[in-house]
Amino acid sequence: MDFLFLTFIPSGQPITSAVMFSAGVVGNIMALVLLEVRRRRTSPSLYHVLVTALLMTDLLGSVSVSPVVLSAYAQGKTLVGMSANAEVCSYFGFNMTFLSLSTLAILCVMALERYLSIGHPYFYERHLSKRCGYITIALIYLACVIFCIAPFLGFGEYVQYCPGTWCFLDMSHAEVKGQVYIGFYASFILIVTSTTVVCNIAVLLLLVMMYRRRVSAHSASRSMTEEVEHLLPLATITVVFICCTLPLVLRVYVNLTGSHEERHAADLRALRLLSFHSILNPWVFIILRPSLLKILWRKLHKPQESTLMRGKTLNSAQNSTGCHLQSNTTI
C-alpha cells in the first residue's frame, strides 16, 4: 500500500498517541516547575538557561505535534487528507525535523558548557555567561528553522509515512538534491551526537581525576556533588537521545547506499523512537533531580566516613594506650 497519498487511516488506535502526549506534557511541566523552584533557591546559571531551553523545546514538541495526530485519528483522515495541499503534513514534518535538530544541538551545547566549566574554569568564568546562553539558543533556533524550510524551496521533501499519522523528510529520495539534503541531516546528527559523547566522556574523566586528588584531603565534596548533579542527567539524556536517533540515522544511510525500496515498518519504528526523546527527557530530570542525588551521594559516602572515623578512633586509642604504658614503665 502506498501511504504517500493515502487520505484515510486504514487502522490504528489513538491510545498510544494520547499516552505519549500526556506523558510529554505532564513531564515537561513538572520538570520546569522543579527547575524554577531550584532557580529561586540558588543563583541562576548558564546551565539552568540551557536546561530550561531544552525542556521548553520538548514541551513545544509535545504541544505542537501530538494534537495533530489525535485530530487525525478523531477525523479518520491521514495528515495528507486533512488539508487540500498537504499543508498539515508539511507542518508536521517541519516540526519533527526542527525539534530533533534543536534538541540535539542544545544537548551538545550543554555538554560543551560542562566541559568548559570543569576543564577550563578560568575561561568559563571570564567569557561565558547567561547572556551567551540566550544568544546561543537563539542562533540554534534560527539555524534549525533555515534548515527546515529548505524542503519548501525544492531541497528535500516532507512525505507521509505509515499509517498516515506521521510526516517527515523523505528518507528514500531518488533525486540528487533530496539525497544530499537528507544525507546532510543524518551526518549532522551523527557529528553532533559524537561531539556530545566525547565531551561527556572528557567531563567524566576530569571528575574522576578531581575525585582522586581530593579524596586524600577529604575536601571539596560539595563541588564534586554539584558537578555530578549536572553530569548525570546530561549523560543519561545523551544516552536516551542516541538510542532514539541512531535508528533513524541508520535508516537514512541504508536508503542512501542501498535500493530505494520503501520499508514502511522500519521507517515507522525509527520515527516513533525519534519522538520518544522529548517524552523521556523531562522524566530524567525529575528522577535525577539534585535533592535525590544528594541523598544518594550521602548514603554512598556514609560507610566510607564511618570507616574513617572508626580508624581514627582506633588509632587515637592505640596512641593513648601506648603513652600510658610508656609512662608506667618510666615510673
Task: Describe the residue ranges of each PLM region.
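Intrinsically disordered regulatory tails of 7TM GPCRs
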Residues: 1, 37, 212-231, 291-331
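Extracellular N-terminal segment of 7TM GPCRs
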Residues: 1-30, 34-37, 331
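Loop architecture of class A 7-transmembrane GPCRs
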Residues: 2-3, 76-93, 97, 146-191
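Extracellular TM2-ECL1-early TM3 structural module of rhodopsin-like
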Residues: 9-18, 46-109, 117
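Helix-to-loop junction signature of class
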Residues: 17-21, 34, 60-79, 100-106, ...
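Intracellular effector-coupling site of seven-transmembrane GPCRs
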Residues: 48-57, 205-248
